[in-house]
Design a protein with these regions (language model features):
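Glycine-rich ATP phosphate-binding loop
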Residues: 1-16, 42
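Intrinsically disordered, low-complexity cytosolic regulatory tails
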Residues: 9, 222-233, 239-319
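Regulatory alphaC helix of protein kinase catalytic domains
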Residues: 25, 29-30
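Short beta-strand micro-motifs within the conserved protein kinase catalytic domain, predominantly
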Residues: 44-52, 61-62
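Protein kinase catalytic-loop region centered on the HRD/HxD motif
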Residues: 93-106
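Conserved catalytic-loop aspartate of Hanks-type protein kinases
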Residues: 168
Length: 319
């Protein structure tokens, strides 16, 4: 849309006919209205009149990371290595701001490529706070119904419905692998052993062939050592044991090279790829909570089982 002064804006219209639509409107308004950060979208205004529920944001010229970097239609944008570093570090700083620099902290709950918008300078902006949760003082987690996007969901959140900062960190780890590899986290058109990016990255890491994950389209500015370091950070963020995942300010320092880390800390990631995994894992969780291994993984053959969506489709579906 265009305002009277000629300013181009992005208009988000939410459903006013469902309780979920109204709830997401209020959640997003509460979460984003009073905070400003270079790597978060800027709320310009809102409308809650009659049946209308509208949020107005600044317009971002280059769409989302899902459309431009990961989209199948291609893009005129050249995502060289330095641009990808800028995007990865920017998103990490935005999440660190939400988690550590405001009170109460905000857990986004839906960090994914389609919610990372790019301005004219390719500065990343985290968007869509409709699923966000405020973390009460002295609380370590919030219990809630599971919502989000399959492929980015932390297993402990999907299984137990406990939202923590580490849930966002897991999602960021998956996103980081996508940024370095230039591919979506799930692609069922590939041979089975290559369909799931997180598993493929772990296998190549164990084989000491991590460089094979890096996007082959990257040009002469590629720093292979730095790209492999980013992939290792992605694996750190997606470890099955929440306690082993670094906090976001530490992730920022790792990405910028200010903090070094030991590869001996990296343990096998966990992944849930369809709803059947949730049912199996939830049953196991109830039966054997105290003996659940930190190295447990769940894998399946599909990535589009409802009620979750594939990684390219925005969703706010609850189970």
């Amino acid at each position: 849309g265009v305002l009277r002064d000629g300013t181009t804006v992005a208009v988000k219209v939410l459903s006013a006919t469902s309780r979920q639509g109204v709830r997401e409107f209020l959640t997003e308004l509460t979460a984003i209205s009073d905070i400003k950060h270079e790597n978060l979208v800027t709320l310009i205004g809102c409308c809650a009149e009659g049946s209308h529920r509208i949020l107005v944001y600044n317009y971002l010229e280059n769409n989302s990371l899902a459309q431009t970097l990961l989209g199948s239609r291609g893009s005129n944008i050249r995502f060289d290595w330095r641009t990808r570093v800028k995007i990865a570090v920017g998103v990490a700083r935005g999440i660190a701001f939400l988690h550590e620099e405001i009170r109460p902290p905000i857990i986004h709950r839906d960090i994914k490529a389609s919610n990372i918008l790019l301005d004219k300078d390719l500065t990343p902006k985290i968007s869509d706070f409709g699923l966000a949760r405020l973390l009460p003082p002295n609380a370590t987690h919030v219990s809630t119904r599971v919502a989000g996007t399959l492929g980015y969901l932390a297993p402990e959140y999907a299984i137990r419905g406990q939202v923590t900062k580490k849930s966002d960190i897991y999602s960021f780890g998956v996103l980081l692998l996508e940024i370095v590899s230039g591919r979506c986290n799930t692609n069922t058109r590939l041979p089975y052993e290559d369909q799931f990016l997180l598993e493929r990255t772990w296998v190549r890491y164990e084989q000491e062939r991590l460089a094979e994950i890096i996007d082959a389209d990257l040009g002469n500015d590629l720093d292979v050592d730095e790209a492999c370091r980013f992939l290792k950070i992605g694996l750190l963020c997606t470890q099955d044991a929440m306690a082993r995942r670094p906090n976001m300010s530490t992730v920022v320092r790792m990405l910028t090279g200010e903090k070094h880390f030991s590869v001996h800390r990296i343990t096998r990631p966990a992944m849930i790829t369809d709803f059947a995994d949730l049912k199996v894992s939830s049953s196991q969780q109830k039966e054997n909570e105290t003996t659940r291994s930190s190295n447990m993984r769940s894998f399946s053959t599909t990535d589009e089982t409802e009620p979750f969506s594939s990684s390219e489709t925005p969703t706010q579906t609850s189970i």
